[in-house]
């Protein structure tokens, strides 16, 4: 039986993400002044490109694998089979990615300027094959991530100060990231196998491809969802200078510092909690969602408001006066934490837990096709401001469509009395005091 570890996991993931971001915050003022906007542009362009391979290798298993295991956590045979299917599938996806990456190096002109950075980042993708997040997430045991990331962040900070001395030393940053990711993920993978007595069962190829095929809708939804960030950067590369990309990606990366610290811990921790609630009954799961909706909306609205108000102070303090142009961009996208939080709540937490994978996929596909077409026009016409507006537009369109289809399906996730601060406090206390999930 599980103890309710939702808030414990949110806290642990929050500490983990703070560690991931706090140490870069310390190094950012130093690094930004050495490598400048152009160096940041090179790093961020390569990172955005390699990000597609990360999505491909991770596939949808942090969602589908977590949901399957958390709903059958007591069935040891099922857990081992699901665990093995994920790992073998990722191995196949990594081999396919290797072929695609080599082709992109030969034919992708944009990568020729910084192919060393791209190669370093791609080598690090072996860590994605053994990424154990879905395992720890399924067992609602995420405390270890905070400890590991504190140690990694401190060592990485020291190495950056020691090795990054000139504007040509920017390649050390992805190098350190690659090395740490490989060792940490493989180590956590081995530890999870021992702790939960997991067995890696050999999977036939037809079974592996069957798993990949069955999860295609969630995977494609994740990929096209990534268009909201990475594709903006890729498209901008056709219309603006590397220096201007540096301005845009600085604001985007700072935004996702906020998202990683506040958004990811909450969404990651509540997903298995909601999924387990739906395993009891649809009614129980729906009631849990209704209680969580107002809590997340208030929290993300306050976070976005703070980001809007304090953007000038934060950008100037961290990056220096050379990045003043990033302030207006960050203010334009300040409410993305709120819109992104609503997209995740309606799509991942609700539609996927109701098993509407195809609907989730179709909504994301439509919104991102519209956003992709519009992004070319806006980026060409308005530069990085156009890309920023497009980011907001896709989120808002997704939210509207999710609400529309939930209404058609007669799924009501809004209970207005739960928006009362007094009721929110009561619901928080009841969740914290809950001793068991089943």
Where are these regions (language model features)?
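Hydrophobic alpha-helical transmembrane segments
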Residues: 45, 115, 122, 146-196, ...
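Interfacial segments at transmembrane-helix termini and the short loops linking adjacent helices
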Residues: 104-121, 309-339, 385
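Signature of the first transmembrane helix
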Residues: 4-62, 157, 216-243, 253, ...
């Amino acid at each position: 039986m599980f103890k309710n570890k939702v808030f414990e996991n949110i806290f642990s993931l929050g500490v983990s993400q703070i560690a991931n971001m706090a140490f870069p915050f310390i190094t950012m003022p130093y690094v930004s002044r050495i490598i400048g906007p152009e160096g940041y542009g090179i790093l961020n362009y390569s990172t955005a490109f390699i990000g597609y391979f990360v999505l491909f290798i991770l596939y949808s298993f942090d969602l589908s694998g977590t949901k399957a295991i958390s709903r059958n956590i007591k069935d040891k045979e099922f857990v081992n089979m699901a665990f093995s299917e994920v790992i073998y599938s990722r191995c196949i996806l990594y081999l396919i990615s290797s072929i695609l990456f080599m082709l992109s190096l030969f034919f992708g002109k944009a990568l020729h300027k910084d192919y060393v950075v791209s190669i370093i980042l791609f080598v690090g993708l072996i860590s994605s094959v053994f990424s154990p997040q879905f395992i720890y997430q399924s067992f609602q045991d995420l405390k270890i991530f905070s400890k590991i990331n504190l140690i990694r962040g401190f060592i990485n900070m020291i190495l950056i100060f020691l090795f990054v001395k000139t504007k040509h030393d920017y390649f050390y940053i992805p190098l350190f990231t690659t090395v740490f990711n490989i060792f940490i993920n493989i180590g956590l993978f081995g530890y999870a196998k021992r702790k939960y007595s997991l067995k890696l069962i050999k999977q036939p190829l037809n079974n592996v491809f069957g798993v990949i095929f069955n999860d295609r809708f969630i995977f494609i939804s994740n990929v096209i969802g990534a268009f909201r960030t990475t594709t903006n950067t890729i498209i901008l590369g056709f219309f603006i200078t590397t220096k201007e990309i540096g301005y845009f990606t600085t604001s985007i990366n700072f935004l996702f510092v906020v998202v990683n610290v506040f958004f990811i811990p909450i969404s990651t921790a509540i997903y298995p909690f909601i999924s387990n609630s739906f395993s009891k009954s649809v009614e129980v799961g729906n009631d849990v969602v209704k209680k969580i909706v107002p809590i997340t909306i208030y929290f993300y609205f306050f976070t976005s408001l703070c980001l809007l108000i304090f953007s000038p102070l934060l950008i100037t303090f961290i990056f220096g006066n050379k990045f003043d142009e990033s302030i207006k961009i960050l203010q334009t996208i300040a409410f993305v934490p709120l819109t992104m939080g609503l997209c995740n709540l309606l799509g991942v937490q609700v539609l996927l837990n109701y098993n509407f994978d195809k609907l989730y996929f179709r909504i994301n596909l439509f919104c991102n096709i519209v956003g992709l077409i519009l992004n070319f026009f806006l980026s060409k016409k308005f530069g990085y401001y156009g890309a920023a507006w497009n980011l907001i537009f896709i989120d808002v369109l997704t939210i509207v469509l999710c609400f529309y289809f939930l209404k058609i399906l007669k799924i009501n996730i809004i209970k207005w009395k739960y928006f009362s601060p007094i009721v929110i406090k009561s619901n928080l206390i009841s969740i914290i005091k809950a001793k068991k999930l089943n």
